[in-house]
Amino acid sequence: PATDLVVYHPYELSYYNRLVGGIRGAYQRGLEVTYFMEAFTPDFMDFLNKKLPQNSVINASFSNFMFEYYQEEGRLRQDFRITEKEDFDYYILLNRRSASSGVKRVLSREDLKTYASVQLTSVPLVLVYKTDTQNSKAGK
């Protein structure tokens, strides 16, 4: 129905029909809720550009290549460092279960705290975690 179009915009790729219970039902059943980086919207990039401190180090897991592309295109600030291996300030996770194999190890770190999220009807599409630098440095 037309109502669904309004609710899901701009996340149409996350659509599930009402037979499965919409996106909430799909999420509860373990189905994918994001696919092709569609949750990294211009609004989300604007949020990162405005809210993250200068020279922040970002690990976007399997999405790092997309963040590097956004930097090349001028959609993401150039002072951000995108990394996969070094210590990071922010961990950005696209909620794509099939591509999240190494993520549990990272998310089990005690120095990570939820900083922000992009949600669709209470289902997280993107999660942004911030490193608690005091705990992180104390543990080194």
Model feature map: region roles:
Residues 76-140:
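Aromatic/acidic, Gly/Pro-rich catalytic loop(s) in extracytoplasmic/lumenal soluble domains
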Residues 50-91:
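Extracytoplasmic
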Residues 37-38, 69-72, 106-109:
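A short linear-motif detector with a strong N-terminal bias
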Residues 26-30, 73, 111:
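Generic, low-specificity signal for short hydrophobic/alpha-helical stretches with a mild N-terminal bias
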Residues 46-50, 116:
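Surface-exposed alpha-helical segments enriched in charged/polar residues
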Residues 1-46, 63-68:
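Membrane-proximal, lumen/periplasm-facing interface regions of secretory-pathway glyco-
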Residues 22-27, 56-61, 93-95:
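Generic detector of short, locally flexible boundary/turn motifs and exposed helical patches
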